[in-house]
Amino acid sequence: MPDDPAAPFRTRLPEARSAPNRLADDPAPHGPAPRPAGPVLRPGVTCWRTARTGRVAVLVDGAEYFAAARAAMEQARRSILLVGWDIDPRMRLDPDRAETLDRFLTRLMRSRPTLHVRVLKWDMPFPIVLEHPHDPLERLDRSTGRRLNARLDSELPVGAAQHQKLLVVDDALAFCGGIDLSFDRWDTAAHRDHDPRRRCPNGEPYGPRHDVMMMVDGDAARALAELGRERWRRATGEAPEPGPAATEADPWPAEVPPVLTDAIVGVSRTMPPFGPPSSRNPAIRESEALTFAAIAAAKRTIYLENQYFASARIAEALARRLAEPDGPEVVLVLSMESPSWFDRMAMDTPRAVALRCLRMADRHGRLRTMTPVTEGGGPIIVHSKVIVVDGRLLRIGSSNLNNRSMGYDTECDLTIEAPDGDGDGDEGGARGGDVSAAIVGVRDRLVAEHMGVACGRLAAAVRGTGSLIAAMDRLQKPAGRRLVPLPVDDPSLTEQAFAALRIADPDRPEEAWAPWRRVPSPPRSTLRAAGAALLTVGAAAGLWGLVRRSALSRAGRGRG
């Protein structure tokens, strides 16, 4: 059944508010997992389910993802489902073409009588909505017929964000990762200092940006379609029908080669508890459990790329591994600093504390905390959410390494795991078979891009040294495109207290408006510093509201 064209853009139907979450299994246990003896992917614990995919592709940076997304949607016959933190109809999938996303979707819908398009964006609160206005999406919804529907998702605890980023075509092909279809996400792997194609709808340029998506088909795509339909149902009260198992055409983009075929993919979620007590959707923390299990399972190398690194518990789990005499290397790639001043206050301050925790534990010299720079030495925003453990596990999704991604926001991550025991080394195909080779190949591709060297050269250096860090040190360049160490900042007492309070970064809904619950019995000096931090953030929040009133036409930077 097509959606009702008269359905409200912002609000949902009342009967869906109390509907149970049909996807909710038992939530994952809270906190670090013990070192797993078997597979890291365990349905009901570290993932919702595992599903087979005929092909897996990893799309690095916005240009590659947008081209694949455009090609896939061009093949759509029955359905396109878009779920995002931000979806802006004014963006262009190809900056060299005049066609915007709204015109592209409208053209597809009007040319195919059986195609239904559903677009679901987080109902952002003030002041974030000033930078990511809802008006363009509402105009798209009002200007099209009953087969193209755009809605806002507000079915979350107050302050929580809908952070999943999904695109599903005909229930046959799906994308998941860190990239929203928004205006400041496009960039190439070259990350040029000044690329005239990196412009917002108002003509304002934005800086280089690195991100990653995964593309899957088969049962894995159908699992993401089910997740997306459930998200739509919870937000709107409407339940789209699943598509048939067989599709008329293969939407896989012909120009995108798979990195792996015939694989098993784990789908992990984060969903906060929400709803009235009689039909409350339980907390789902599979991505959190997966993060700790992956860290615990590592034998030689943990490679992390992320927008944030603000979780004290994740830092402590990594620190424990660094303290082991024969533990794994840890390579962490982050932005030089968050682009938004609010994120610098809320996320970079606890990041400094977390990084100090790692440095103090690194008695054996197995830690590298790095940031990528352009050919001219300028910063590159790292927005990707990637975990690679040895040749054993690759996770790509929407989850940040902060607290709210563990249990407060909605998240979705995809994971590929090599058969138990096959991916312990870094040599990939030399020891671990096709799955391990693909996992190591993705990691080496990412590191090589950041370092400005050929992927084959990095892979050879890893094989020759037996160490990712040794290979990186060997290939390090004094100038040009490269990875440079993150600056060492020792946080003050006030900054430590601010980090402990986790302002804007709660772990669960009950902590959101009670930051004092996050710090168990701190000493008196820390309490005084915490009070100062609260006064500071209160004054800053008030100033933020005033300043952001002038930002309606400006592009948001770095969030999502």
Place the predicted regions along the sequence by residue:
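Charged, low-complexity intrinsically disordered terminal segments
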Residues: P2-G560
